[in-house]
Regions:
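Active-site Tyr-X1-5-Lys
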Residues: 4-33
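Amphipathic terminal alpha-helices
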Residues: 161, 170-178
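NAD(P)-dependent short-chain dehydrogenase/reductase
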Residues: 23-73
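Residue-level signal for the nucleotide or nucleotide-sugar donor/cofactor binding architecture
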Residues: 11, 73-79, 105, 155, ...
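Active-site loop of classical SDR/Rossmann-like NAD(P)-dependent oxidoreductases
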Residues: 144-157
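A short acidic, glycine-rich active-site loop
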Residues: 2-10, 65-71
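Substrate-positioning beta->alpha
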Residues: 15, 46-50, 65-89, 95
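Mid/C-terminal beta-alpha module of Rossmann-like enzyme folds, strongest
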Residues: 81-141, 157, 178
Length: 178
């Protein structure tokens, strides 16, 4: 995993993942579980998706996205990540597990689910305006988030189901995102 270099949160997650994997190799006697989660959604979640729906953003009838980009996105419910964390602590399982609900939602579909109209915008204009809004402290996220939204991580959850023994109850579909 390389993360998204211009979005520090993503970059740091990838660095921590690499360090944990190195530790796991150097200390096989220690049980290490690395959980790579997709975007968590639910009524108690505070993350980038929930911030995009808060004031003043919720008053806009549209949401910008990079023209030509309609990436597939995955989600994981609060209930599922809670169960996965519990099982990781209680079980003897070891290794790296990708955690996401089954299926994907396209970014423009997510925008419509949020009750907005997708507004395609040239990449340079969107990056520049987001950087300016971040610098002015008017946006809750830096322009680097656009890379994560253009090139999101889509997980293969086979090991979660077969080795870890858990299949998320909620899927990455319209019903779960709402």
């Amino acid at each position: 995993m390389s993360g998204t270099p211009r979005y520090l949160y993503s970059k740091h997650k990838a660095e921590v993942d690499r360090m944990a994997q190195e530790f796991m190799k150097q200390h096989p006697e220690i049980q290490v579980v690395i959980l790579r989660g997709s975007i968590v959604v639910g009524p108690h979640t505070q993350n980038i998706v929930s911030k995009m729906t808060e004031w003043p953003w919720r008053s806009f009838p549209w949401m910008f996205h990079v023209r030509g980009a309609d990436p597939a996105m995955q989600f994981l419910s609060e209930e599922d990540i809670g169960e996965i964390l519990y099982r990781a602590v209680k079980s003897e399982v070891r290794g790296v597990f990708n955690c996401a609900g089954e299926g994907v939602v396209r970014f423009t579909e997510l925008v419509r689910i949020l009750g907005k109209s997708p507004r395609p915008t040239r990449a340079w204009a969107l990056y520049a305006s987001t950087a300016l809004l971040w610098w002015l402290r008017l946006a809750p996220f830096p322009s680097g988030i656009l890379d994560l939204m253009r090139y999101p991580w889509v997980a293969d959850t086979t090991r979660l189901k077969t080795v870890f023994g858990y299949t998320p109850r909620h899927t990455s579909d319209r019903k779960s995102v709402v």
